[in-house]
Regions:
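One-carbon transfer enzymes
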Residues: 1-253
Length: 253
């Protein structure tokens, strides 16, 4: 049984870990987000069944003592499932089977955060990708991916749920090939799209004295609709900030 260092957050991180545990896979260490950034963190910790000395925080993964600990644990593969911390090269060199990331985007489109937003705003392909981690952000060789259809009624939230589901399914369907080393490894093209967190803030403010193409404005509003998270907004002349969320429904004939 291969030795797995598991790095996970969010519902996908929980569901993939549950699936691995149900199959009696060998999780030798767990890395979670710090408490203020955790989603499903306590459930992930409980599911791992690991004692506290084998559970680590994402903020320490590139520290020397953590790297020394990983060399002792000897993981053969590192799995990053909706995990938001960047790995140093020294850590990536430890597992013989490499470091894998599950990303809710159809790479090379949607590199970086909020791929659900940018598939709508940029009108680029959406999907799920399982890929190797390299020194770039979501730029490593692709193992496998699947597309997800973006409907005009989708919001940032509904598309995220679809991408989340596709990611979990993609991992389950391909884990055996990864363990056996029979998976494909395809270099990513240099094209595609990449966005930062700051890019989202640039589209969030809708200026009342500017003209927008209707299609673009609708796309921004629906892409940023994901309650209770912040959405697109307007600033009124009296200084009030008003958030805008939309609901789209197909007409019934």
């Amino acid at each position: 049984m291969i030795r797995i260092l598991y790095m996970g957050n969010n519902l996908a991180g929980l569901e993939v870990l549950k699936w691995l545990k149900d199959r009696n896979e060998n999780i030798v260490g767990l890395v979670v987000h710090p408490p203020e950034k955790r989603k499903y963190g306590e459930e992930i910790i409980h599911t791992s069944g690991l004692p506290s000395e084998f559970i680590f925080s994402g903020v320490e993964i590139n520290q020397t003592n953590f790297l020394d600990r990983m060399r002792e644990l000897k993981p053969e593969i590192i799995l990053s499932i909706f995990f938001h911390y960047t790995l140093r090269n020294e850590l990536m060199q430890i597992p013989r089977l490499g470091c894998l990331n599950l990303h809710p985007a159809y790479l090379p489109y949607g590199k970086g955060p909020y791929p659900n937003v940018w598939s709508i705003v940029d009108r680029t392909p959406a999907g799920a990708t399982l890929h190797y981690i390299d020194k770039g952000i979501d730029t490593g060789d692709i193992i496998v991916q699947k597309k997800v259809i973006v409907d005009f009624t989708d919001t940032g939230e509904s598309l995220y749920r679809k991408l989340e589901k596709a990611c979990i399914e993609l991992f389950r369907e391909n884990w055996e090939a990864i363990k056996k080393g029979t998976n494909k490894r395809i270099s990513q093209p240099a094209s595609g799209t990449y966005h930062t967190l700051k890019d989202v803030t640039k589209i969030d403010e809708i200026k009342l004295d500017e003209n927008y193409e209707a299609g673009y404005l609708i796309d921004v509003l629906r892409a940023r609709t994901f309650p209770p998270h912040e959405s697109a907004y307007v600033i009124l002349s009296d200084g009030r900030k008003i958030y805008i969320r939309v609901s789209l429904e197909e007409a019934q004939e």
